[in-house]
Amino acid sequence: MANAAKTITVEQIGSAIRRHHSQRATLIGLNLNKIGRTAELQDTPEVRGMITKVQHLVRIVDEK
């Protein structure tokens, strides 16, 4: 399993209401659209950058 991709699970903890449209688009890109939803994503630099952009709205639940 040398090629097994690492995954990261994120949960939305903040609302997208009254946020900039680019932050809303980032949440949609992370497959999140409601508070309490979780998404399991590949752990790539691109995804990490998206999480950093909306770090006040999401939390990392698990890293595998």
From Swiss-Prot:
Concerning InterPro entries, the annotation shows:
Ribo_uL30_ferredoxin-like_sf (IPR036919), Ribosomal_uL30_bac-type (IPR005996), Ribosomal_uL30_ferredoxin-like (IPR016082)
Give GO BP annotations, semicolon-separated.
translation
* Alphabetically ordered keywords of this record: Ribonucleoprotein, Ribosomal protein
Report which superkingdom the organism of origin falls in.
Answer: Bacteria
Q: Name one GO cellular component term.
A: cytosolic large ribosomal subunit
| Ribosomal protein keyword on record | yes
Task: Report the Pfam families cross-referenced here.
Answer: Ribosomal_L30
GO terms, molecular function: structural constituent of ribosome
Keyword Membrane in the entry? The reply is no
Report the NCBIfam families cross-referenced here.
rpmD_bact
Complexes and interactors: Part of the 50S ribosomal subunit.
Q: Which family does it belong to?
A: Belongs to the universal ribosomal protein uL30 family.
- Provide the protein name: Large ribosomal subunit protein uL30
Question: Which species?
Answer: Rhodopseudomonas palustris (strain BisB18)
